């Protein structure tokens, strides 16, 4: 498995790091509502070719947007994914849950990424925490 956590990223100025233990790891990132397009990229590279399921750790906050827009790149193509907060069930006493972004054929030497974006239209906060790749 490969995990890319927010702690390993160069964070754009519009995003705020929240130092709390209610996400994956010790922190997560928040983007407040803005009309300016903002993105945050979680880059990854696999060491062996194969099919991988990609997840993100979804954090539910009272101020969160109902929709979170992402772009997943397998190193060749990009695919848009929209997470609807109303369709994600957070179980137990956590404030988040691993949510699948789909299965992708990934190749060694072809870096990919998961990118969070607001497209300048989101009305609530966007939370970004971690990305997980699990080989199938």
PLM-predicted stretches and their roles:
Residues 1-136:
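Extracytoplasmic
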């Amino acid at each position: 498995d490969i995990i890319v956590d927010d702690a390993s990223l160069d964070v754009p100025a519009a995003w705020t790091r929240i130092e709390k233990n209610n996400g994956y790891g010790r922190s997560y990132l928040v983007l407040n509502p803005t009309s300016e397009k903002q993105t945050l990229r979680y880059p990854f590279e696999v060491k062996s070719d194969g099919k991988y399921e990609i997840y993100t750790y979804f954090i539910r906050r009272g101020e969160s947007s109902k929709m979170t827009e992402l772009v997943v790149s397998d190193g060749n193509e990009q695919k848009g994914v929209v997470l609807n907060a109303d369709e994600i069930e957070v179980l137990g006493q956590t404030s988040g849950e691993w949510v699948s972004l789909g299965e992708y054929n990934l190749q060694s030497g072809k870096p990919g990424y998961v990118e969070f974006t607001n497209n300048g239209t989101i009305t609530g906060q966007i939370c970004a925490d971690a990305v997980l790749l699990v080989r199938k």
